[in-house]
Amino acid sequence: MDNCDVLIIGTGLQESILAAALSWQGTQVLHIDSNTYYGDSCSTLTIEQLKKWCGDVNSGKIHQFQDAQIYIPGGKQSNQYTSKDYGIDLTPKIMFCQSDLLSLLIKSRVYRYLEFQSLSNFHVFENDDFQQKVNATTKQDIFTDKSLSLMTKRYLMKFLKFLLLDPDYKQRVKPYADTPIQVFLQQEFKLEEPQINELVYSIGLSYKEQTSTKQALIRMKRFLSSFDVYGKFPCMVSKFGGPGELSQGFCRSAAVAGTTYKLNTNLTDFDPISKIAHFNDGSHIKINEKIIISPTQLPKFLQSSYNKVVENLQPYYVTRLVTVVRRDCKEWMSGNESSAIVVFPPHSLPTDNQHSVQVIIQNGNSGVCPDGQAIWFSSTVEQDLSRAKVDLESAFEKMETSLLRESSEEIVNDILGDNNNNNNNNNNNNNNNNNNNNNDFVMNAQGTTTPVLVNSFKLGSSLINFVPKDKLEIVCKLGYVEKTFINPDLSNIFKPTKTNNIVYKDVEDANNEIIFTNMPSSELSYDGIITDVKSIYQRITGTTDDFFDVDFEDEEDEYDRNNQPVVQPKRSSVVGGIVGGGSITSLTALREQHNENNHSDNAIDSDEDEDEDINDMNDNEEEDDHGRGPEPFGADEMEL
């Protein structure tokens, strides 16, 4: 290969989507990665790969990550694991069923390389427990929730009708647009703190207390409009891994379209005059148009240029704690699902956290770990990194206590306490603990053997006066910090300028040949990624009109003829048409089938009498007021 139009460095999700988009439009692309695997900053890694990754981060080989620490208990004989059985995402995300990325997966046919599973359980931590579970996505759910008073149900219904059906929506919101959402919900709808927390932090996945009304409502509508697109759930996760799996899917699509791939390859030099790029294997190539570079794989000769590009950009830090536990955590999941969301709102932890702690939980049925285990992906955008780590550890301890309390078969004995047994076992436990820690694998940022995140907090007596004696068995614990220039509210993605977004920054002495990409955002969903990619695409081609503007219909017909679905046993059943352990053949066909089977009126009817609804449900809370099953809210516009 003597020349190419575009050289892309890094196989992260943004770069992989870009490679596919360019290739399908006839652009000749060379796509390289310094790693031996795909995904870059979005990789899905095994435990052994994570050990090496931590070393590379702390040695400066991998940029934009820091403070990488891994702890693998080795004393207990039960902690025997097979590294390749784990797929741990560096930047885990969930996908709303109404989203640009999912639409692109369908349009580009990349979904054929992936499997999806439904996600419907969103939990909010409140009053030292996970008593509130966000599943009130139909009128029946709201009215049959015995934890809510009739008046609260009425206020909640008024708000949800307003959010999705009120023709005067914009006019009513306008005076509150920049006011904290809590004020709007309290003054206009008389909602109380528990309901506000669920709406803002779980359904809306807002990260801060002072989220504006305009932004919070858009986030809530995102959840509600995604419900019932493919089934009775708002979100999905990809099986066997998140963004890393999607990256590979788009790379495969790009390869089909003509992109050339080279892993374990670094850019060592580039002459902007001759446009010749040199690589670590001694090869070279002429670049006709642009070089796109992921910040994690920044060549040494461009370090000073990169520093100048970002010197006036606001950095944001995302602190993450990933814990693999020997519990499947089914207590927090619905039916045959294998994932759940847990959110700790601001000020809900003993550490008085200033920002939300958000947790994605996935168990063995998602393909990311063995059966009977689960991975907890927790994160926070707290900018005080010391405090962020303390918040994450506190959230872990709360989850641990709650899970053990819910699943314990000896709660009564633990509450009463067996002092004699405790006293007799103390010495033995201490000796066992000492022996168990002898073989622990520990790596921290300094290369020493200090345990990771050693802070602990005593749990209060408010946890139903029960603190389990046992601890969760941990397979692996990983902590690290990611640096990004994307605002957590995604404002500089949806409203980018040359002063707030790295993609639009010119690189000095590069003749406008080099573009740096953004690191992944702190956003828990995939929102903003397609917009970000389109920004790069436009800088290369001058327009986004032809972005994936390809007719895939003929290819789809041929694929369907040659790949008839094979019925085979699945570990779990299909939930709402999305995988619960098996595969799907056509998301579009699935949506059409779901719409045909769900043709009755919307769950919220604008002309219904609300008092009659409440009275009917009060008479018989086990049935819907019209004798129908639960139905979803309808989709609405996503912008004010």
From Swiss-Prot:
One of its GO terms (cellular component) is membrane. Transmembrane segments: none annotated. GO terms for biological process: endoplasmic reticulum to Golgi vesicle-mediated transport; protein targeting to membrane; small GTPase-mediated signal transduction. Coiled coil: none annotated. Signal peptide: none annotated. The keyword Nucleotide-binding does not apply. GO terms for molecular function: GDP-dissociation inhibitor activity; GTPase activator activity; Rab geranylgeranyltransferase activity; small GTPase binding. The keyword Glycosyltransferase does not apply. Substrate-binding subunit (component A) of the Rab geranylgeranyltransferase (GGTase) complex. Binds unprenylated Rab proteins and presents the substrate peptide to the catalytic component B. The component A is thought to be regenerated by transferring its prenylated Rab back to the donor membrane. This is Rab proteins geranylgeranyltransferase component A. It comes from Candida albicans. The lineage of its organism: Eukaryota, Fungi, Dikarya, Ascomycota, Saccharomycotina.
